[in-house]
Amino acid sequence: MIALIQRVAQARVTVAGRTTGEIGAGLLALVCAERGDTEAQAERLLAKMLSYRVFSDADGKMNLPVQNMDGNGNPGGLLVVSQFTLAADTNSGTRPSFTPAASPEDGRRLYEHFVAQARAAHPQVQTGEFGAMMQVSLVNDGPVTFWLRVPPA
């Protein structure tokens, strides 16, 4: 399972002109399930993402996770958006292949599991809409962007 995480000052996702999720400072996570992924990969990826230290401490060092973004125990927002194109195979030709991505059914199941687990573990979770054409806007803070991956079993 893959997550492209970005530290943001704010982010929003809309579907057909309707806002489905919006956060202030926090993390925007573009999430993708790969063939062979299970709930175990989703849970490991979420645990890594929530504890990944990408926010600056009082000394300006990247040392704080989204769960304690300000160093005083206050969490930042988490906006989770499905994006199957993260699993694209771009090694040959000029058209990406999406064979490495999970099937739509498995992708939806794992995305929904990821979101449910995120909501159980983090107080500020917003989402996009699985399978929809979405418009994602963000103000990247840094910019700070990381690619996290837990390989399929």
Swiss-Prot record:
<keyword id="KW-0963">Cytoplasm</keyword>
<feature type="short sequence motif" description="Gly-cisPro motif, important for rejection of L-amino acids">
    <location>
        <begin position="142"/>
        <end position="143"/>
    </location>
</feature>
<dbReference type="GO" id="GO:0000049">
    <property type="term" value="F:tRNA binding"/>
</dbReference>
<comment type="similarity">
    <text>Belongs to the DTD family.</text>
</comment>
<dbReference type="InterPro" id="IPR023509">
    <property type="entry name" value="DTD-like_sf"/>
</dbReference>
<dbReference type="GO" id="GO:0019478">
    <property type="term" value="P:D-amino acid catabolic process"/>
</dbReference>
<keyword id="KW-0378">Hydrolase</keyword>
<protein>
    <recommendedName>
        <fullName>D-aminoacyl-tRNA deacylase</fullName>
        <ecNumber>3.1.1.96</ecNumber>
    </recommendedName>
</protein>
<comment type="function">
    <text>An aminoacyl-tRNA editing enzyme that deacylates mischarged D-aminoacyl-tRNAs. Also deacylates mischarged glycyl-tRNA(Ala), protecting cells against glycine mischarging by AlaRS. Acts via tRNA-based rather than protein-based catalysis; rejects L-amino acids rather than detecting D-amino acids in the active site. By recycling D-aminoacyl-tRNA to D-amino acids and free tRNA molecules, this enzyme counteracts the toxicity associated with the formation of D-aminoacyl-tRNA entities in vivo and helps enforce protein L-homochirality.</text>
</comment>
<dbReference type="GO" id="GO:0051500">
    <property type="term" value="F:D-tyrosyl-tRNA(Tyr) deacylase activity"/>
</dbReference>
<keyword id="KW-0820">tRNA-binding</keyword>
<dbReference type="InterPro" id="IPR003732">
    <property type="entry name" value="Daa-tRNA_deacyls_DTD"/>
</dbReference>
<dbReference type="GO" id="GO:0106026">
    <property type="term" value="F:Gly-tRNA(Ala) deacylase activity"/>
</dbReference>
<keyword id="KW-0694">RNA-binding</keyword>
<comment type="subunit">
    <text>Homodimer.</text>
</comment>
<dbReference type="Pfam" id="PF02580">
    <property type="entry name" value="Tyr_Deacylase"/>
</dbReference>
<dbReference type="GO" id="GO:0043908">
    <property type="term" value="F:Ser(Gly)-tRNA(Ala) hydrolase activity"/>
</dbReference>
<dbReference type="GO" id="GO:0005737">
    <property type="term" value="C:cytoplasm"/>
</dbReference>
